[in-house]
Amino acid sequence: MGSCRFCYVERDARRYQRMKQPKFSEGFNLTLHEHCLDEPLTEFKGGRVFVCPMSDVFHERVPSEFRDRIMEVTRKAPWHTYLLLTKRPERMAEYFQTRKVPLNVWLGTTVEAAEYKYRIDILRSIKGSFKFLSCEPLLGDLGELDLTGIDWVIVGGESGFKEVRPMKEKWAMNIKEQTDAQGVTSSSSNGDHTAETVYGEEVNTIMDTFKW
């Protein structure tokens, strides 16, 4: 996938493995941490939980039973809001065909280039209370966007490598103009100077509140 080319996740996973961090003993290999799923139950002050930020819950190798456990926790700890972000919205849609999306679960998909705009339609087809797009890393102009049913859009460039593909300000501005026109909340990703130029004070008004 285009946005995965210089992703920080594999680099960080291997670094944490070298640092002997228990959760990363397998490096970048897919590992299910069942013992971590109940952590939100011990935090009683409500917050936003980014579920599996260094992975994809809807990866083909993640069993539905593991997703069921995650959904169980979201219901047991309804004082938190949980964000599920995927590059595989078709698998997300298939999963929720036979399951109700809890009101405190936000569903999102990554749209880093125009060729992936089809994911928006798939996300829109899922019955959920809150849906968002992550246009990060933004690798090109997305053109015209239909944001019907979308509640939030995050915009950011690639980060973490010397050979990062730069995001052009006009690409971010195109998204901001359309979110403003369609009444959709949008913000830039933390530390992205190009996006900050476009979004100014709107930077991370939502994302800064994450707990995990």
What residue ranges belong to the model's regions?
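A general structural detector for well-ordered alpha-helical segments in enzyme core domains, enriched
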Residues: 66-70, 119-123, 171-175
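Histidine- and/or cysteine-centered catalytic micro-motif in compact active-site loops
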Residues: 87-89, 110-112, 136-138, 158, ...
